[in-house]
Amino acid sequence: MLGMRPAVLIGILALGLALGSIVLGHVIVVPTLQANTSLVDANLARALAEPLALRSAELCLAAVVVVAAVARAWLRHHAGTTLGLLAAGLAATDRFVILPRMHEAWARVDLVAMRPAARIEAAEQLSLIHEAAAGAIAVVLVAIAVLASWKREAKS
C-alpha cells in the first residue's frame, strides 16, 4: 500500500463503502428490522426502518460520487468514468425519487390490517423498483471492481 496512488486508495475505499452500504443497509439491516414484528407492530417497524434506508442510500450516493470523481485517475479507462457516472445517476434517482415515494406509499398503508389493498400493491411495486435500482447499482459497482482488477498494458 505504500507505493499506491491516492486515487487508487480513495477509489477502493469509496467502492467498498458503496457496496457495503447496499449490502449491509438495503439487504441485511432494513429488511431484518422490517421483518422483526415480535416487539413492535409492522407499521412501527417499517417507520423505524425508513431513516436507516435513507441514510444507507445517502452513504451509497456519496461513495458513488467519489468513485465517479476518481475513476479517470484510478482506473485509467474511459469505461470507468462512464460506469461511475451511471452508478451516481442510479444512486441519486434511488435516493431522491424512488425511496421518498416508496416510504410515502408505505405510510398510507395499514400493515396490521393489510388495507387498502390497492395502496399495498402500489407500495410493493415501488419496493420492487427500489430493489431493482439497488441491484443495478451493485452490478455497476461490481463492473467497476472488475475493471479495476484488470491489468492494463502500458502504452509504449
Summary of predicted features, one role per range:
Residues L15, A63-R76, A136-S156:
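Transmembrane alpha-helical segments in integral membrane proteins
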Residues L13-V23, T82-L99:
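Hydrophobic alpha-helical membrane-insertion segments
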